[in-house]
Design a protein with these regions (language model features):
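Non-catalytic signal-transmission and effector/linker regions of two-component phosphorelay proteins
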Residues: 1-3
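Active-site beta3 strand of CheY-like receiver
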Residues: 46-52
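Two-component/phosphorelay signaling modules centered on CheY-like receiver
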Residues: 11-31
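Conserved acidic carboxylate
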Residues: 8
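Helix N-cap/capping motif at the beta->alpha junctions
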Residues: 32-41
Length: 53
């Protein structure tokens, strides 16, 4: 299962992407964040396969 990180500053588009990923059952959502600083921290501790921005 591919590990995904979502980076989006607007709440609604971020939540929509989360829902689509989770409903597909094909991806593991590692984190969904609203900024680059938090995204970099996630990338340092997780092996991310795909980043959606």
């Amino acid at each position: 299962m591919k590990k995904v990180l979502i980076v989006e500053d607007q709440r609604m588009p971020r939540e929509n992407m989360e829902r689509i990923l989770l409903d597909s059952g094909k991806y593991k959502l590692c984190a969904s964040v609203n900024g680059a600083d938090v995204a970099l921290a996630v990338c340092r501790r997780e092996k991310i396969d795909l980043i959606l921005m």
